[in-house]
């Protein structure tokens, strides 16, 4: 028999969190509570390749551009964030086609199939991202994943900071986590 806490996933009570998934259909918003899935819906129709969140912001890597939305603007309440049924207003940032996005120290990072890594200051609101200024951080192998200041690329793992992208080792990095953990074609490694 479900407990009261488990039933709350279907209401607007506390204890729920909205997570975002990148899919071929678009960005899917899912309300979860512990191990239960509640309400879900498509937040943005596009070919989403990666999604990242930081504070109220949701960034999406697509085949056309990097898109950003402000979850707090969706319901007019700066103290809360949007749920799956709230419409998010995604705006293009001008990066171009991207394979991965991530946030690090108040900045949005993006990478593409050509290995270009760019950094953009996190906006005060998503609407200002339409005029975002991207700074090229470095060039690596095809970018596959970004988390924090780490980039997983076809030719290894890179640390990104103000001085650029520095090779941190390994080859054929498939995914990265700021722990720092790296998934490669030959196994899982801790940097």
Model-identified regions with their sequence ranges:
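Acidic, polar-rich N-terminal leader regions of halophilic archaeal proteins
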Residues: 1-191
């Amino acid at each position: 028999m479900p407990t009261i806490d488990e039933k709350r996933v279907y209401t607007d009570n506390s204890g729920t969190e909205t997570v975002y998934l990148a899919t071929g259909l678009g960005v899917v918003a899912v309300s979860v509570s512990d191990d239960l899935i509640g309400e879900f819906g498509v937040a943005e129709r596009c070919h989403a390749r990666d999604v990242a969140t930081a504070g109220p912001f949701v960034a999406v890597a697509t085949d056309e551009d990097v898109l950003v939305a402000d979850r707090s603007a969706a319901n007019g309440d700066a103290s809360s964030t949007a749920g799956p049924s709230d419409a998010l207003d995604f705006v293009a940032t001008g990066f171009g086609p991207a394979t991965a996005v991530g946030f690090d120290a108040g900045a949005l990072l993006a990478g593409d199939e050509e290995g270009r890594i760019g950094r953009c200051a996190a906006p005060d609101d998503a609407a200002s991202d339409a005029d975002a200024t991207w700074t090229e951080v470095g060039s690596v192998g095809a970018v596959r994943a970004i988390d924090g200041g780490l980039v997983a690329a076809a030719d290894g793992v890179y640390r990104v900071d103000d001085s650029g992208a520095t090779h941190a080792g390994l080859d054929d990095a498939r995914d990265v986590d700021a722990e720092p953990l790296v998934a490669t074609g030959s196994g899982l490694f801790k940097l």
